Design a protein with these regions (language model features):
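Acidic helix-start/capping segments at beta-turn-to-alpha-helix junctions
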Residues: 11-24
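Surface-exposed patches in mature extracellular/periplasmic domains of secreted proteins
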Residues: 8-14, 38-40
């Protein structure tokens, strides 16, 4: 449609080629697949700055604010340098909206987070919740 047939896309779902979501970046980097469409937050082990190119839980009021981040002077250059260091290029963001934080018990205030167990990607938000007493 957009390429006049010169570009062919074959989609693979649910880690069917590469294994875990965190491994997709490496698979694209090494040529096993041609493209990665996972969250940059999975790559915080390589460089903590990937957190800001990905999911910043609670960092924005709406997805458009994250898009606006790249318009800030120097931001696109910083993101390009981050990805280029690993032989990759960010060609666009897929931002589905706010991440939800759901619980089987009420969390009315910050002290209620103590000993709260939940699944979270590694990086900034896990460190923040840990500092508040949670167990990500």
């Amino acid at each position: 449609m957009f390429s006049g047939g010169s570009l062919k896309v074959e989609m693979f779902y649910s880690s069917s080629v590469t294994g875990k979501s965190a491994e997709v970046f490496n698979s694209a980097q090494t040529g096993i697949i041609d493209c990665d469409m996972t969250g940059a937050g999975y790559q915080t082990g390589k460089n903590a700055a990937f957190q800001f190119a990905g999911d910043v839980m609670g960092g924005y009021d709406n997805p458009y604010q994250q898009y606006d981040f790249l318009k800030f002077p120097g931001a696109q250059d910083a993101v390009d340098a981050l990805y280029n260091k690993y032989g990759m290029t960010l060609i666009g963001w897929w931002i589905p909206g706010h991440e939800s934080l759901i619980s089987s018990k009420p969390i009315p205030d910050v002290p209620s987070i103590k000993d709260f167990k939940f699944r979270s990607p590694p990086g900034m938000e896990s460190m923040i919740f840990s500092a508040l007493g949670a167990k990500p």
